[in-house]
Amino acid sequence: MAQKGVLWNGKYYTIPQAASKIDSSALAKSPLGGANVLAVLGEMIGLIPPQTAMQVGNPSLALSLINPISEEARLASQLVFQPSPGTDTPGASQVFFLPVNPATPATLDLGTMVLASYMFGLPASQLKVKVETGTTGKKISVAFQDNSESFDNLEKDSFSILYTGTGSAATMTIDVTLANHKLTTAITGAADALNLDLNTYNTIQALVDAINATGKYTASVVTGSPNDSTMLLDAVVTQDIKTASFTAGSDLQAAVDGINSLSAYFSAARKVDAGAAPANINWTYATGGSNGATTNDDWQAAFDVLKTMQVDLILLISDDPSIHSMGDAHCTFMSGPTGKSERRQFVGGALQNWNNPASRAASIVSLKAAAANLNSDLTMHAGLGCYQYDPNGKPKLYPAYITAAMYAGIAAGSSPVMPLTRKTLRCLGLETNLQVTETSDLIDSGIAPPFPDTVQGAGYVVSRQVTTWNQDSDLYHIEFSVGRGADYLAAQVRKRHEQIAGQPGTEGMDATIVNLTNGVLQDALTAGYIRSYDPKQTQLRVDGTIRYVDYSAAPILPINWIFSTYHLLPTTATIQL
């Protein structure tokens, strides 16, 4: 039969009438996402495992995680959170630290259990351990430099058992090896022997119930945790259970659990087939802690970790140009159609020689070559090193990647469109005070050096936020905040569009796509991320299963130059006497 009605809004109409629906998609609020997650990559030892990104929210926690031997990493960790003096320019608040060097922990074999330090690197080998008889059970003490910890009463009773049958003698054996894992008894003069598989009776309560079910034994749960695993019992060999009740324990597991739950320095693991608490030993040092020798493969592994994360900014604690190029390649991939996670990086090179005119000229050439080698709008090169206080409170000159840490901190504490130009840096001085011609030359070449703040007459600021891009004069590529702001807005629109993928391609859904796009633009306008936009310019074109959306907005550009002209007016006067 021919269809005589129409389908609209999910309902089929045959009777002429008016109908209505509400489209509120233009009013939908989907707040703009964050854009200030910073990842810091470099050689560092301490409590962060290698090739593991750990989120840190404040500078104090960063200091507690990074060992003092990693001086530059610790300094960078402070500068990203506090890159500028005063409160006008806040620092980062979401920072991931990712050690690239293959550092190893220190370990200590206690015979039946192995301790592994939480600390990675050579200092971990300064940890020492003592095992002795405690008030009850074992006492394990740990010392590191001037700090120590002790854990007493490491023992655990699990269940008691007494043979009550007619046999003249009875013994019990608990075999904890992986091959057997059984509780067995040997009875003289009666057929009351037990042969219980601990894989079957895998809790203390289940084991006690199975023993009591024979009617030939009296067993009781002693532990406060009846669901404790029987696989963690201590070994027992031909123990008399006829003349007196015997209490089986889990003392080894008590020692393991005690270390794992209480120690700030070690984790513990029982060894395969071990079945007794560790023997007493005098103070013994752990061994094997190493800082590791970092290779480019280690750096690549760290960048691969970042591929699984949503980060926006990257700081590389390295002066190696090959590492800078690897980081830029990572940013390029992740900012592309496959990565779909836009990000940019900050780098700095080694200290240069500025002692004489020839050396200065060579240093300028070297910095210009570094920018030319990168030639990327995703990398900002700080150029010059800076003076900071060292751990002893004395001024020390550090490489340019420490200056880059301040750049990264300022960016991570600001909106995506905030220019870094003329932002004040927290430093005592610079590697050199560039001449005006040198500064201009470096900026033209794609280096963003700091220079003295001539406006305030003190301190140091970012000269101009140029990237290392040298291919054209497009501000999207040249000015860090312009490119970052545009990338941010495009990512926010894309994320809203992702919500529509898989929906039916109705005209109403097409209107929703347009409304969502304009909603993001309006939110960006309200937040000051764009200067203006025209919602009527947002266009959608349908091609089968494809939706092409075109939209436009005026980006926020930095104010780089203000040229003023003072027009002098002639003085005229009429004097009457």
Whereabouts are the PLM-identified features?
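A glycine- and small-residue-enriched flexible loop/hinge signal that marks low-structured segments
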Residues: 2-18, 22, 32-120, 124-178, ...
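Short, contiguous acidic and Ser/Thr-rich linear segments
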Residues: 193-199
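Serine/threonine-rich, repeat-prone extracellular segments and beta-strand-based repeat modules
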Residues: 535-541
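C-terminal edge-of-domain segments
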Residues: 541-577
